């Protein structure tokens, strides 16, 4: 009888409560063992004995639990994996907190290293068994049910898969490729999850650009927030903040490269989001700025800056390798594997990608240094006889133009963008360390083992003074026939490493630029810089008291404390009318309107015949010109209407009394004198008071609702609907009538015995 898959298998067991036999599915929560998996924590950064002991104890629990899990039979294993939430949290904590190979770390104790290796192996075997649906011919799960179990129970997701690739891809590539391929094959829904995850991955690049104060892709920019207007550039931000950005970029690039290297079938999903163009534009905008920021901080922490430069170089290399993997998977491999009839679409895709990147000159130059574009185009020419030569020539010409002014031979030999020179001829980056160069040349097979060592470079300040003289003397003591100028050139080339200079000179392995120099070249002594005090510039430069620019100073104008000549100086200053006399003639020119124009005998007005008009000019007659205090009494009377003095008026109105238009009209009708009653009519007084109250309420905007029907009917006869509504309205709005919870407070007093009930 053939064995049934685990998802269809039924097992018979005894009910612990009734003692009777019953049948239940093999995958059931009751089959789960009662075991708690503790969370993983990373090893301590400081080798403090107490922290190391705590880590070893916790890691031992995790390792023992995983070993117990791996030893379970097929059905028990899957019940524990599916229904035990603590197991999933334990595995997630390991993927999240375990140190990556490119993370900062210190030398751990040997027992910590051994425990890390044991945990690493146990976690990998656990995920490997979780991704296998058939262990043997008797223990397996049907493929359709296996995919549903993985997807519905969140045993795998895209972030977990990315972490698995970056953690276990080195050394376990075949097993990891089979594992992830099986997951995507049995559950195609992970492709849609990856498609939904890619906008988040692209947002990582946008966040880095925004945090660096760089403008991203114009098609994807959003309105800028007010608090984002003052963002710092990489050159201005603090060093620790720059360090966080570089580490974040290094982690992102390494993770994406590891995933695409393990599972290249995901390249199609990446390219759906125009990933190649977004990657190249990010490289062009961010990488040069970060390089410049590191180079400008040469005088700061050299060890930290060397580590940042190494990680940035590693990130650059991974970005270009990601681009190459995608290009190779979606264009080049299909061309090599397909027939001649089916390759035109892939060739068009290749040409379209590079046509969109022609303005990214820095990216093209660095990519061409690692993966020559001419070789790929040569492959296209061999595969297709109808290739558009105009487009290919245009792309090659754009790549060549990106190399203008750059030492291409040096960059191609290095096979790394960190040694490429800028168009101005200066090295693009900090000098590469001699140790990294020697290791790369003598052990090329180890370059792939240390992924983080790609293009290792260190930042160091330029030597000068006593330090430089000491280095030159170290070399000259062993090689006295060499000139100091030649030794200085060698030290500058090999980053001031005297051991490397001596070794290369003795082994005749100097760089070509150094071999052409004269070995007896003398050292050129640089002139001393200008002293600071003789080159200062401020607001007192070259004044009468500047002792740095003149030898003699008028000491009579220098006094200590209060000057004795202050009174004389003040009086002489007030009596000095030279400034007034100098301005008098200028202001006299403004008096162009005069009553009489003095003329010499026989002279006439030169402008009389031109500007004279016999018509009277009344333009300004209606304007009041001049001050009122200089006017005569007649003019004041003519301008101001005559009014009766207050003392002569028959009726004196009260000051500050404001009356409306309606009241004025009523007063106009009642101007006749009224008899003075000793006691006025109360009805008239009530009408006036009511009128004043209604006028006041009208000004306040209040409208009294006179349609109240709260009287109601006698008790026992029921109430009308209007009465009920009015009572409800009165109860809801009683606060407007100064009823401050009287019923509530009265009940409270009565309940406390204040008022006898």
UniProtKB/Swiss-Prot annotation:
Acidic residues composition bias: residue spans: 657-670
Taxonomic superkingdom: Eukaryota
Record note on what altering residue 506 to A does: Loss of ubiquitin binding
Domain CUE: 467-510
Listed CDD domains: CUE_ASCC2
Phosphothreonine, modified sites: 233
Expressed in which tissues: Ubiquitous.
InterPro entries membership: ASCC2, ASCC2_CUE, CUE, UBA-like_sf
Pfam assignment, any one: CUE
Subcellular location(s) of the protein: Nucleus; Nucleus speckle
Cellular component terms per the entry's GO annotation: cytosolic ribosome; DNA repair complex; nuclear speck; nucleoplasm; nucleus; RQC-trigger complex
GO BP field: DNA alkylation repair; regulation of DNA-templated transcription; rescue of stalled ribosome; ribosome disassembly; ribosome-associated ubiquitin-dependent protein catabolic process
Main location: nucleus
Region (Disordered): 617-687, 699-757
Keywords annotated in UniProt: DNA damage, DNA repair, Nucleus, Phosphoprotein, Transcription, Transcription regulation
Protein family (similarity comment): Belongs to the ASCC2 family.
Domain notes: The CUE domain specifically binds RPS20/uS10 ubiquitinated via 'Lys-63'-linked ubiquitin chains by ZNF598.
Binding partners and assembly: Identified in the ASCC complex that contains ASCC1, ASCC2 and ASCC3. Interacts directly with ASCC3. The ASCC complex interacts with ALKBH3. Interacts (via CUE domain) with 'Lys-63'-linked polyubiquitin chains, but not with 'Lys-48'-linked polyubiquitin chains. Part of the ASC-1 complex, that contains TRIP4, ASCC1, ASCC2 and ASCC3. Component of the RQT (ribosome quality control trigger) complex, that contains ASCC2, ASCC3 and TRIP4. Interacts with CSRP1. Interacts with PRPF8, a component of the spliceosome. Interacts with ZCCHC4.
Function, as annotated: Ubiquitin-binding protein involved in DNA repair and rescue of stalled ribosomes. Plays a role in DNA damage repair as component of the ASCC complex. Recruits ASCC3 and ALKBH3 to sites of DNA damage by binding to polyubiquitinated proteins that have 'Lys-63'-linked polyubiquitin chains. Part of the ASC-1 complex that enhances NF-kappa-B, SRF and AP1 transactivation. Involved in activation of the ribosome quality control (RQC) pathway, a pathway that degrades nascent peptide chains during problematic translation.
Name this polypeptide is given: Activating signal cointegrator 1 complex subunit 2
Native source organism of the sequence: Homo sapiens
